[in-house]
């Protein structure tokens, strides 16, 4: 028998946020700043930000590459053309390396603080 232990929910959690982007050069800085504020006081969460560039024709990829050089948490999946949000999410889910993976919108329609609430419920057995 082989046993595969799950995440140590009381210890440090490796969390991947999967962020599909299409022509979002105006939203990326705000998104990263908000995520940084939300997770600044969470020592038990290590973040991986998986941005999936879904064939953007603006400077989205250029900005992401610049951000990645300065921030080792950032990973980029660059799709060859616009495949749509579902395909971008699928590519990001495949690339994510965290113990927990959460898709989130770069436009902040779903506030990142909700992710912390979800983690708290998860750690409490929900």
Each predicted region: which residue ranges?
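Structured catalytic core of nucleotide-sugar glycosyltransferases
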Residues: 1-126
């Amino acid at each position: 028998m082989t046993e595969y232990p799950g995440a140590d929910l009381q210890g440090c959690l490796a969390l991947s946020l999967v962020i599909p982007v299409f022509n979002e050069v105006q939203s990326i800085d705000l998104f990263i700043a908000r995520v940084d504020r939300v997770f600044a006081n969470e020592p038990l969460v290590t973040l991986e930000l998986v941005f999936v560039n879904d064939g953007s024709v603006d400077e989205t990829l250029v900005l992401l590459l610049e951000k990645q050089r300065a921030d080792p948490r950032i990973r980029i999946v660059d799709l060859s053309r616009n495949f749509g949000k579902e395909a971008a999410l699928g590519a990001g889910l495949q690339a994510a390396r965290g113990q927990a993976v959460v898709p989130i919108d770069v436009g902040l329609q779903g506030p990142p603080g909700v992710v912390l609430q979800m983690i708290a419920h998860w750690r409490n057995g929900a």
